[in-house]
Amino acid sequence: MQNAIKDTEQKSYTTLNNCVACGGSNLEKFLDLAEQPLANNYHDGSGAGDSFQLGLNLCTDCYHTQLPVSVNPTAMFDHYLYVTGTSQTLRDYCDWFAQFVTDREQLTHGNILDIACNDGTQLDSFRKLGWKTFGVDPAKNLFEIALEKGHMVRNAYWPISYPQMDVITAQNVCAHTPNPLEFLEGVKASLTAKGTAYIQTSQSQMYQRNEFDTTYHEHISFFSANSMKTLAERAGLVLTDIHITPIHGDSYVFVLKHQGADVQSSVTETIRKEGTEGRHTENFYRMFGLNARSIVEKLKDLVTKCQAEGTPVVGYGAAAKGMTVLNANDIQLDWIVDDNELKQGLLTPGTNIPIKDRSSLDIDKHIVVVPLAWNFFDEIRSNVEEVREGKST
C-alpha cells in the first residue's frame, strides 16, 4: 500500500479506472450511493470532513467489484475507532479462527503475522495456542494497545520488509487496499517456502442477500472466488482452498500458498457456484443496484412514519455499514447506541446523529430499534432485551 499512499499524498482521492484484481479497464457502474463522508469520521460537532463518490463498478472481465474512487488511506486508518475486542462475537470468532489455523497447519510454536492486527485480539488467541505473535497496523492508537499486550507489532502500512513467517493472516484488510496486487506480493515475500496465508474478506453473500450497506470508502474491493484467484496468480501465489465462515455476513477465507501447492476442489466448486448464482452476468449486478435503492427508500418511509407517530427510532451499532444506509437517503434516527466507548458522545458523519451507550435504551416509552450492525444481530437483541426487560420494543 506504500506506493498507493504516496500517489495520493497530494490529493484526497484517486479515481480507479482499472480493475484492481485483473488490471482490466472494462468497468461498468451498477450502484450509485451519491457522495458520502467517510463512514468512520465520527465527530464532536466539528463536522465529518469531505464527501466522496460512493458506489460500485463491475469488472466485466473477471467479475470483480470495486469502488469508483480510492480515498487517501491515511485519512481513514491513521487513527481508527473500530476495535476488534469490543464485540464478544468477534472475540469468540478470533478464538475459533486461531484454532482453525492451528489445526490446519499442525503447528503450535510457529511464527504468525497478523496484518492490520487492530488491538491485538486475534493475536491474543494465537498466543494462547503457543504461537509467536507478530503484527502490523497503521493506526497508532490501536498499535499501542497491541504492543502493550506484548505482541511484536509495527506501526505501518503493509507491505513492509518483514522476516519470513510460517503463517500470515489478513482479516478484512486486503479488500481495503487500493493496490491489492502489491499487498499480496508483500505477503509472498514474507512467507516461508511452505508457509500459508489466510486472506479473509467479508460479506461473501452480499449480492445474493442485498447487503449493499457494506459498501463504504474503506472497502475498496469485494472479491469473488474468481477475482481472488486471478489476483493471487498475478502476485505469484496460488489459491489452494476456500472456506466460508459465519462472521461479518459470512466471510470468505482464501488460503494462499506458493506456486506448486496442491489445489483443493473447493476452489473450482466455489467459482462454479458463483456462476450458477448469476455472479458472472452483468444483469445480476444491475438488479442489485435497483434493489438497494428500493431498500433505502422503504427504510426512510418507515422511520418517518414511526417518528410522526411519536415513537423514537434508535439505531444499534454505529457501524460503517449503518452510515452508508443513513447517508444514502438522509435518514434521521433519534439516536444511535454503540458499545464502543471511543464512539460514545460523538456524532455520526453526515447525518449528525448522537451516539450513546446502551443505558440510553432504558426509557419507559415504546421505541423501535434498527440493528445497523446487523452482522451482530443476536448480540444486539440480547443487549436490548437485557436493558429493556419488560418494556415495549
Q: What are the roles of these predicted feature ranges?
A:
Residues 49-145, 150, 155, 211-212, ...:
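Extended interfacial segments that mediate partner engagement and assembly in macromolecular machines
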Residues 160-163, 174-178, 351-393:
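Phosphate-bearing ligand-interacting subdomains
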Residues 137, 338-340:
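Conserved acidic E/D residue at the C-terminus of a beta-strand in Rossmann-like folds
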Residues 169:
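A conserved beta-strand element that flanks and buttresses the S-adenosyl-L-methionine
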Residues 181-196:
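A short glycine-rich, Lys/Arg-flanked "PGG" loop and its adjoining helix->strand segment in the class I
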Residues 248-291:
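Flexible, glycine-/basic-rich loop-and-beta segments that form/coincide
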Residues 3-89, 243:
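N-terminal juxtadomain amphipathic helix
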Residues 197-221, 225-227:
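Short, glycine-/aromatic-enriched active-site segment of Class I SAM-dependent methyltransferases
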